[in-house]
Amino acid sequence: MNGGAERAMRSLPSLGGLALLCCAAAAAAAAVASAASAGNVTGGGGAAGQVDASPGPGLRGEPSHPFPRATAPTAQAPRTGPPRATVHRPLAATSPAQSPETTPLWATAGPSSTTFQAPLGPSPTTPPAAERTSTTSQAPTRPAPTTLSTTTGPAPTTPVATTVPAPTTPRTPTPDLPSSSNSSVLPTPPATEAPSSPPPEYVCNCSVVGSLNVNRCNQTTGQCECRPGYQGLHCETCKEGFYLNYTSGLCQPCDCSPHGALSIPCNSSGKCQCKVGVIGSICDRCQDGYYGFSKNGCLPCQCNNRSASCDALTGACLNCQENSKGNHCEECKEGFYQSPDATKECLRCPCSAVTSTGSCSIKSSELEPECDQCKDGYIGPNCNKCENGYYNFDSICRKCQCHGHVDPVKTPKICKPESGECINCLHNTTGFWCENCLEGYVHDLEGNCIKKEVILPTPEGSTILVSNASLTTSVPTPVINSTFTPTTLQTIFSVSTSENSTSALADVSWTQFNIIILTVIIIVVVLLMGFVGAVYMYREYQNRKLNAPFWTIELKEDNISFSSYHDSIPNADVSGLLEDDGNEVAPNGQLTLTTPIHNYKA
């Protein structure tokens, strides 16, 4: 009975090891399943994703025998949990010549070096005494490679065997015991492998617009084949240099100008980022105020702040302001000059277009401009004065009207500048414009002033020409014949009188002649009006002439209404107011009343 109990006690370690082995297998299966889902399996002590297929050395320095390979996915699961314990199968007492096939299986579930080893019990055939007296120790053996048998997951990768070397653990020395038929090693149950399932078909989910083929992609990465201008795993976004056109829903190229754009990519609306002075959706032209589109962009217009725009190709300024002109608005227009101060402002010339050409210029050493050219009759820096031989007439210089009777050498001005009156008339002329002859001179057919001549009769019948001057100064010589003298004197005086009247008429000016004519016309008109008035009065007098005495009352109206009188005296006898014998009805409705008072009836 004691032997049976002892055998039962000895079999307990074997049963415990078997239970531990089952637990280790379950833990390994769970780890393999999680690793298969992640796509990675890590060998014990190895790098991630690497498989060590080399067999380890056998026990006691003997060559190792190859183990059957177990399939496992190459992907390694991330190590996120705590270190896992390595479970060892219980070792049975073996002889030194034992085959390596009886080497215990080491199942590793992680890189942890913690080892749990079941205690080795004595052989059931070994007596206790021998166990106590045995001093022989077994040589330490090198750990044998352990092959982990796992089931393949749904990953499409090719399963390979993963060899995990077991950590070196000193073995407990066991005494060499004779083999006995009673001692037996529990057989290790074979590992069962789950049947592998075929990999499922990969769904591409490529973009209909951006991919070449909706159902064609890389089965490993899932990358679709994109059209030009598209990118992304499913070709769902636009590449750099392209933008999404919301109208068509397609990725279109930006087409930004390399000269005018700061960068080739554009924004989501397709607008490029332009350089300074460049405009346009693709930055391909210069904006107002810039010119010369090139690889450096556009240059600002050089218009001296007098124009806001210029020609896009040549840079010539357009619409120059502030009375300026030129390609860069650097000059002043006609009739303007550039001020000498720092502003360089274009100011209007102080030159009238009536007196000059209107243009002016200013010298570098002067502060006031001068007119370039004055018209005839004007002088001065601003052409505002009359030249010699001209006079001011209502702010206009007119030429002196002296008819050539003033010497311009002796009298340069010829006439007074303020009034135009001729100065120093020559050629026996006088007057405001030298239009008259001096006393004793008359105009000839050519308009010159010549002396007057008088024809005097002689006793012999001939005539003598005597000038007016000689007549006024000489005294006639008396003659012997007394009868001839009065005749001669009368003739002389008559001739002198006629000559004086002619001279008087010659001295009458045109203005005076006009006044005389006007006066005569007025007198004639007044006389005609008086004559017409007299005729009218005479006819009226004839029409109103009466046969009655002067005290007769005249009634001017033929129809006289007596309605008021009849209303006041309804029973009055109008015919009895006057005597039939003593009153007569005057013609034209006139009523004549006689003087006797008794002719009226009460």
Curated annotation (Swiss-Prot):
Q: Which residues lie on this side of the membrane: Cytoplasmic?
A: 536-602
One Gene Ontology cellular component annotation held by this UniProt entry: basement membrane
Q: Which residues are glycosylated?
A: N40, N182, N205, N218, N245, N267, N305, N428, N468, N481, N500
Give the signal peptide, or none: 1-30
Mode of membrane association? Single-pass type I membrane protein
Residue ranges of the TM segments: 515-535
Q: Which residues form the Laminin EGF-like domain?
A: 204-253, 254-300, 301-348, 349-399, 400-451
Tell me, in one coarse class, where this protein mainly resides.
Answer: membrane
Disulphide bond pairs? C204-C217, C206-C224, C226-C235, C238-C251, C254-C266, C256-C272, C274-C283, C286-C298, C301-C310, C303-C317, C320-C329, C332-C346, C349-C360, C351-C371, C374-C383, C386-C397, C400-C415, C402-C422, C425-C434, C437-C449
Keywords of this entry: Disulfide bond, Glycoprotein, Laminin EGF-like domain, Membrane, Repeat, Signal, Transmembrane, Transmembrane helix
Stored InterPro entries: EGF-like_dom, Laminin/Netrin_ECM, LE_dom, LMN_ATRN_NET-like_EGF
Q: Does the keyword Transmembrane helix apply?
A: yes
The cross-references to CDD domains, in alphabetical order and at most eight, read: EGF_Lam
Task: Output the Gene3D superfamilies linked to this UniProt entry.
Answer: Laminin
Comp. bias regions, Pro residues:
167-176, 187-199
- Cellular compartments annotated: Membrane
User: Low complexity bias: where?
Assistant: 68-85, 139-166
Q: Give me the Extracellular side stretches, as residue ranges.
A: 31-514
Question: Would you tell me the protein name for this molecule?
Answer: Multiple epidermal growth factor-like domains protein 9
Species lineage? Eukaryota, Metazoa, Chordata, Craniata, Vertebrata
